UniProtKB/Swiss-Prot annotation:
UniProt cross-references to CDD domains, sorted A to Z: SAICAR_synt_PurC
Pathway note: Purine metabolism; IMP biosynthesis via de novo pathway; 5-amino-1-(5-phospho-D-ribosyl)imidazole-4-carboxamide from 5-amino-1-(5-phospho-D-ribosyl)imidazole-4-carboxylate: step 1/2
Broadest EC class assigned to this enzyme: ligase
Keyword Ligase attributed: yes
Species this chain originates from: Pseudomonas entomophila (strain L48)
Keywords of the record: ATP-binding, Ligase, Nucleotide-binding, Purine biosynthesis
Name of the molecule in the record: Phosphoribosylaminoimidazole-succinocarboxamide synthase
Pfam families, per the entry: SAICAR_synt (PF01259)
InterPro entries xref list: SAICAR_synt/ADE2_N, SAICAR_synt_PurC, SAICAR_synth, SAICAR_synthetase, SAICAR_synthetase_CS
Signal sequence, start to end: none
Length: 236
C-alpha cells in the first residue's frame, strides 16, 4: 500500500490518500487538544497508544458484528482504514452524567443514567459542535432517517459490547462519542475509539482515566491511557 498526499489534518490525526481509492491511512499524532482546539500540547507516546488502543477496540467491535472502517495496523502510529463518506454528526451515548450534560442540565456528576441516553451533535468546531436532533439531521441533509436509525442501533450495540469489556477490566464506561460514514452503501463506524473520545473511570475509586485528565489539569494523562490499555490487554 503506497502512502500518498495528506488529505486532511485534524486536531490529533492526519489522513493520507493511498494508491487504493477505497483505502486511507490514519496517522495518530502526539497532539492533544481541548476546548475545540484552543489548547494544544504534545504528549509523548500518545499517538502510539491511541493507534493501538483503537485497533484493539475496533477488532472487538467487528467480532461483535459492528462494521468498522478499520482494516489493519501499519505501524506504531498508523493504520489502514476504509475510505468512508462521513456523516457530519457525532453520536454520544451516556451511561453516567458527566461533561457537557452536567453543565447543560445542572445535574450531579456521576449519576447513573437508566436508560442510557443517546444524543446527536453537529460536527462543527466553529460553532462548538452544537446539540441537534434527528429532524435537524434530515432537514438539513446531513443524513437520512434510515441512516439515523442504523447509527443509533449501532451506537447502542457498541455501548453494550464495550460496557462489558471495560467493566471486566474494572472500569466504568461513562460516555463516548462515535462517528459514522457510508462505505459502498453500508453505514460503518468511522474515526476512532480511544480515551480521547470517551470517559472512563476506575470502578472502585472513580478516578478519571481519560482525556478529562488533560482538560482538567489532573496530570499523568498518558500514564492513565496506558493503565487502561494494560487492563484491557492491549499490546502496546
Amino acid at each position: 500500500m503506497e502512502k500518498r498526499d495528506e488529505l486532511y489534518r485534524g486536531k490529533a490525526k492526519s489522513v493520507y490518500k493511498t494508491d487504493d481509492a477505497d483505502r486511507l491511512i490514519l496517522l495518530f499524532r502526539n497532539d492533544t487538544s481541548a476546548f475545540d482546539g484552543k489548547r494544544i500540547e504534545q504528549l509523548d507516546r500518545k499517538g502510539m497508544v491511541n493507534n493501538k488502543f483503537n485497533a484493539f477496540i475496533m477488532q472487538k467491535l467487528e467480532e461483535a458484528g459492528v462494521p468498522t472502517q478499520f482494516d489493519k495496523l501499519l505501524g506504531d502510529n498508523e493504520c489502514l482504514v476504509k475510505k468512508l463518506d462521513m456523516i457530519p454528526v457525532e453520536c454520544v451515548v451516556r451511561n453516567y452524567a458527566a461533561g457537557s450534560l452536567v453543565k447543560r442540565l445542572g445535574v450531579e456528576e456521576g449519576i447513573k443514567l437508566e436508560p442510557s441516553t443517546f444524543e446527536l451533535f453537529l460536527k462543527n468546531d466553529e460553532k462548538g459542535d452544537p446539540f441537534i436532533n434527528e429532524s435537524h439531521v434530515v432537514a438539513f441533509g446531513w443524513g437520512t432517517a434510515e441512516q439515523l436509525v442504523e447509527m443509533k442501533k449501532l451506537s447502542l450495540k457498541v455501548n453494550e459490547v464495550l460496557s462489558k469489556l471495560f467493566d471486566d477490566a474494572g472500569l466504568l464506561l461513562v460516555d463516548f462519542k462515535l462517528e459514522f460514514g457510508v462505505f459502498h452503501g453500508q453505514i460503518v463506524l468511522g474515526d476512532e475509539f480511544s480515551p480521547d473520545g470517551c470517559r472512563l473511570w476506575d470502578k472502585e475509586t472513580r478516578k478519571k482515566m481519560d482525556k478529562d485528565r488533560f482538560r482538567q489539569g489532573l496530570g499523568d494523562v498518558i500514564e492513565a491511557y496506558e493503565e487502561v490499555a494494560k487492563r484491557l490487554g492491549v499490546p502496546l
